[in-house]
Curated annotation (Swiss-Prot):
Signal peptide: none annotated. 3-amino-2-oxopropyl phosphate binds at residues 7, 18, 192, 213-214. This is Pyridoxine 5'-phosphate synthase. Belongs to the PNP synthase family. It comes from Thermosynechococcus vestitus (strain NIES-2133 / IAM M-273 / BP-1). The lineage of its organism: Bacteria, Bacillati, Cyanobacteriota, Cyanophyceae, Acaryochloridales. The gene is pdxJ. The active site is at residues 43, 70, 191.
Length: 238
């Protein structure tokens, strides 16, 4: 069964809405771990719309599970990662006008620069994951970068309307997991997963960790972070 990485970005979204000091993502991470989170994920965006560099530095000191830093493959972010040294980095595409990450990296068209970033980070002892769609050409390109992990983008599955469409997307993800494993890649997954749709993804053999954020933070507003994480853990690791 997959483990659970809790993305706490939207705790910071609430804080930044008022440009104040609360709620503190660092405190939220502690509560998530108390609830059973196996890891903490944050996305330090170039526009700093939610998570701030201060948050990542404090999380590096306080997280007791593992810290996954999502970031764009830019020189600024590489320098920050090399300085802070998260447990691993997930490279994601980023556009300033998007509300949230809209799809996977195009590794095929960015093979050379992504490979350089992967090798720089992994050469410094920081494992790298590439956030990609479950597309055979992208999977093959990801393997060529020497990244240790991929994170399969589950957004199309999450957004699929109707049972037939959802099962089709689930089959694509299942095939992607198997191809990735055959290429020697370790597999995580995430994006758009909720309490109502996570079960089928959690049952896919070969996925190591599910990274889930918005739905957990949404429930935490009502029942508290510890209980919200416990509820998700019960669904993915029954």
């Amino acid at each position: 069964m997959a483990t659970l990485g809790v993305n706490i970005d939207h705790v910071a979204t609430i804080r930044q809405a008022r440009r104040t000091v609360e709620p503190d993502p660092v405190a939220a991470a502690l509560l998530a771990e108390l609830g059973g989170a196996d890891g903490i994920t944050v996305h330090l965006r170039e526009d700093r719309r939610h998570i701030q560099e201060r948050d990542v530095r404090l999380l590096r000191q306080t997280v007791r599970t593992h810290l996954n830093l999502e970031m764009a493959a830019t020189p600024e972010m590489v320098a920050i990662a090399l300085d802070i040294r998260p447990d691993y980095v997930t490279l994601v595409p980023e556009r300033r006008e998007e509300v949230t990450t809209e799809g996977g990296l195009d590794v095929v068209s960015q093979q050379e620069p992504l490979t350089q970033v992967v090798q720089t980070l992994q050469g410094a002892g920081i494992p790298v994951s590439l956030f990609i769609d479950a597309d055979p050409t992208q999977l093959a390109a990801a393997a060529k970068t020497t990244a240790q992990f991929i994170e399969l983008h589950t957004g199309r599955y999450a957004e699929a309307k109707g049972e037939v469409a959802q099962q089709r997307e689930l089959a694509i993800l299942a095939d992607g997991v198997q191809q990735a494993k055959a290429l020697g890649l370790r597999v995580n997954a995430g994006h758009g997963l909720t309490y109502s749709n996570v079960g089928a993804i959690a049952r896919l053999e070969g996925i190591e960790e599910l990274n889930i954020g918005h739905t957990i933070i949404s429930r935490a507003v009502l029942v508290g972070m510890v209980q919200a994480v416990r509820d998700m853990k019960a669904l993915i690791s029954p």
